[in-house]
């Protein structure tokens, strides 16, 4: 599952929040022990893995040691866009999506075993199995 955000938006958010500019020319990934430097062009993609749904929160694990400062800003940006505090950071690599303010979504998801969640810039795909 990938979350992609235009790079200039990340720069603007961090500059506004922290009063400093951020210039990242590449992100380093460790893939099978091989260090790969990936240039940033247009979008910054955060790789996350669906962990679980406890009836109130969906937990997503960040993959590939995503830059911590950017993730903190991502959480703030998503919450501001939605107008509610639904996204939080738990530990070093877990994003928590709170559904408490969306009881109809909780009611729907509790009837199913959520196996996977995948989303891109245009859609949200949830793989559900009846309990």
Predicted regions and their residues:
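Extracellular/lumenal and peripheral-membrane lipid-interaction modules
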Residues: 1-131
């Amino acid at each position: 599952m990938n979350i992609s955000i235009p790079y200039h938006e990340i720069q603007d958010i961090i500059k506004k929040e922290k009063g400093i500019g951020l210039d990242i020319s590449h992100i380093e990934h460790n893939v099978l022990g091989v260090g790969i430097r990936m240039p940033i062009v247009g979008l910054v993609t955060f790789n996350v893995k669906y962990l679980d749904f406890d009836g109130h929160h969906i937990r997503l694990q960040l993959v590939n040691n995503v830059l911590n400062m950017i993730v903190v800003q991502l959480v703030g940006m998503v919450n501001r866009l939605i107008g509610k505090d639904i996204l939080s950071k738990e530990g070093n690599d877990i994003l928590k999506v709170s559904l408490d303010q969306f009881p109809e979504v909780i009611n729907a998801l509790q009837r199913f075993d959520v196996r996977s969640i995948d989303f891109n810039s245009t859609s949200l795909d949830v793989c559900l199995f009846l309990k």
